[in-house]
Every structure is written in C-alpha cells, then in structure tokens.
Amino acid sequence: PLEKIKESTNAKIISNASAHFDKNSDVIYFDPYKLTGYSFHGLILFNEDLFEEQAISNKDGIALFNILEALKNQRFEISIKDIFIEKLKDALKEDIYFFVNNSQTLPYSLHFALKNIKARELIRTLALDEICITNGEGCSLGLSRPSRIIQAMGYDETTSRNSISLTFTQKLEEKEIEKIVNTIAKKYKQIKVLNQGN
C-alpha cells in the first residue's frame, strides 16, 4: 500500500514501525511504551534534510542522529580491566564484592559493588573529580530507584543499590589507574563514615 502512495505523492511518509516496518517509509517511529513498558520517544529519520522538520519529532531525531555519530566514534580499551580489579581489591579489601564473574563479562566493562553505601552517593562525589561511573541504569538513578537487573538476579533491594559499573575507553598507565582507584577508595570511605553518623 505505501508503495502505491509513493507513486501518487511527493509527501513524506511517516510510519509506526512498532509492529511493521515498511521500506517505503521516509520516517519511522516506535511506540516504546508498547514495546518495553517504558514511556519515551523513538524516532528514526532516514534523510538528513528531514532534520529541518524538527516539529515532527520534538527533536528526538536529532538526538538519535547524535547518538549514532557517537557510536561510530566510540572506542573501548580492553587491556586494563584486570589491573583495575586487582587494584580495587587491594584498596577496598572486604568492602568490595562482585555480582558476576568478571572474566565472563565484556573486556572493557567492570561491574562491582561496595558495601553499605548507595551507588548514587559515590557517582555524585566522583563526578567532582571527573571520574565517571554508573549504576548501569540511568533511568533508575534519576528516580533514585535500585537496579531492577540486580534484583532480577535474586539480590535484595538494599544490595541492588550498591551496583557500580566502569567502562574503559582509553589506555591508562598504572599510576593513573592507582590514582583513580585511590580516589574511589577515599571517597567511598568518607561516605561510609558519614552514613554511620546518620
């Protein structure tokens, strides 16, 4: 049907691709709520000149374009994960634990937890030192909710709030790694002491 419409008009065809994708569409959009249960926008524009029609997309198309460009330029560093693990274990001793066997995870990603603090407390304070960590779920962090994924693995709500993730994007010398790890350990211990006073 869209092919026939294309033959009779120069209008841009905007289609909902949640259930069916038609190659004759100029623009497709998704109903993420129906697909995932979460309410957000999903729009893909196929021709760059369509970006001028921002009102159609509430600028989501520009965001998607920028994300695509960022992904094209994305780089990962796979040689420093094991060093980070050992340095973190040395600095944090019994206060660090792992939800998964890190040898079975992506070589540029490290997932761990620190006892008796919420990950968001450490995320905020380390950002001041330009050390960016995440709990892996931006939407949950924004709502101050614990990780749904960790809970699905069988951990309780309190434990799931401890989840921390690092992604390695550049080569670091051992001294740089030690500096980052020491900062993480220092900030963690400060937060832990402050929490004990509450």
Q: Which stretches of residues belong to each language-model region?
A:
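PLP-dependent enzyme catalytic core of the Aspartate aminotransferase-like
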Residues: 148-198
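Active-site PLP attachment segment
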Residues: 22-69
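Conserved PLP-dependent catalytic core of the aminotransferase class-I/II
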Residues: 74-125
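Catalytic PLP-binding core of fold-type I/II PLP enzymes
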Residues: 1-27
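Conserved C-terminal alpha-helix-loop-beta "cap" of PLP-dependent enzymes
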Residues: 109-164
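Amphipathic alpha-helix from the class-I
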Residues: 62-79, 172
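General beta-strand structural signal in soluble alpha/beta enzymes
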Residues: 13-17, 28-32, 99, 133-136
